C-alpha cells in the first residue's frame, strides 16, 4: 500500500447526524450542540417544500413546512441555519435533489458572507434527480431537464468548488423501492455512467479535469438482510 492510500485509510470518518428541525434557528442550535459534543460534520435534512421548490405560503406546502426537516427558502434562512458555524472547517452533507443547485448556491453565498472562499468548501449534495423518478418522487422538472441541472452543477463545482462532491449516486433508495441487490447496483452504476457521459459530452469540463470529476462522485449504497448476497454485491461494486 502506498503512502497516499495509507493516509486515506487512517483518516477518521466524518461523524454527522442527519437532522433538521422545524426552523432554521432550532436546527442551528441543534447543530452547534452536536458539534460541541464531538460531531465532526453536518448532515442537513430539509422539509418537503424545500425539496420540491415550494415557498412555505404555497397552498401545496400546507401542513408540510418544517415537518420532516428544516425549511430554507432564502439566504437569510441559510445564514441563520449556519450562524456561528465555521463552514470553511465543515464537511457538510445536504440531502437535496431537485433543488440542489439552489441550496448549494445559498450555501456558497453564506460562506462568502463569512469570508470563506468557495474553493475551501467541503461537502456533498445528493443531486441524484434521476433516482427520484425511480423511487422517492421529489422531482420538479422532466428527466432531460433534470439531468441538465445535474450536469451543469457538476461542471460548476469542478471549476469553482473543487473539493465538493456535487452528486451522491443513490442505490439505497432503489432497493427500498423493490430492486434486488444486483439490480440496485446495476441501475445505480448505469445512472452514474450516464451522468458522466453527459458531463463529458456537454463540453463544460476540460479533458484534463475529467478524472477529478469522476473522483468527486460519491455513492449511497443499501445493505439489506441477504447477508451473503450483500457481501458479494459490495465486493463486486468496489472492484
Annotate each predicted stretch with a short phrase.
Residues 1-230:
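Catalytic alpha/beta active-site cores
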Residues 195, 235-238:
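Glycine-rich ThDP/TPP pyrophosphate-binding loop and its adjacent helix/strand module
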